[in-house]
Amino acid sequence: MNNQTFTLQPFPSNETLPNLQITGSITRHHNQLTINYHLMGDLKAVVIPPLSNTQTRKHELWEETCFEFFLGIKDSAQYWEFNLSPAGHWNAYHFHGYRQGMTEETAFSVLPFDVNQSDDLSLVVNIDLSQIISAKQTLEVAITAVIKHSNDTVTYWALTHCGVQADFHLRDSFMIDL
């Protein structure tokens, strides 16, 4: 089993940002991947969509507050992007290379995850990767978040920011090996 903790950093900005922190952990046990996200701080400054009664696959979740992760196979250009909304909606996309050949990943018909909100917001996803990769393949992972603020500004959070603009697809930012 491989377990690591993480802290996300906002893309550098000249704007004053609300007092927020995004931390969590990621674990891979055989081909089960579990990611725990924790958003803490001034949540009143964040637009958090209400939890829906039905979790559905939706596009463009990254236009609102959304937790994301990217999975790449070591020594391969292909990768997957997973989007998880605090409302319970989700999507998964497959790419053949950097921002190339984006298609909805049909190996997943559901992507169940849990969302809890009190003084902070937590989201936990547990996914069986057997449908897309072998347990013997090494994963390169990027963990990210898009935070929409109550003043309609958006901030982009990641383990690291490798470009001159926020770009979660840059392979250099897939920093966690599992």
Features from the language model and the residues they span:
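Order/disorder boundary and secretion-linked terminal/linker segments
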Residues: M1-P50, K58-E60, L159-L178
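Solvent-exposed loop and beta-edge segments used for protein-protein assembly and interaction
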Residues: T16-P18, T27-L33, L61-E63, S76, ...
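Beta-strand-rich interaction surfaces with strong enrichment in secreted/lumenal proteins
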Residues: I22-I26, F108-N116
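Beta-strand secondary-structure signal
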Residues: T23, T34-H38, E68, S122-N126, ...
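Beta-strand elements of well-folded, non-transmembrane domains
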Residues: I26-R28, L39-L43, I73, I127-Q131, ...
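Extracellular/luminal beta-rich ligand-recognition
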Residues: Q55-F108
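Acidic/polar low-complexity flexible segments
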Residues: K58-T65, I73-Y79, A135-L178
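Surface-exposed extracytoplasmic segments
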Residues: P112-L129
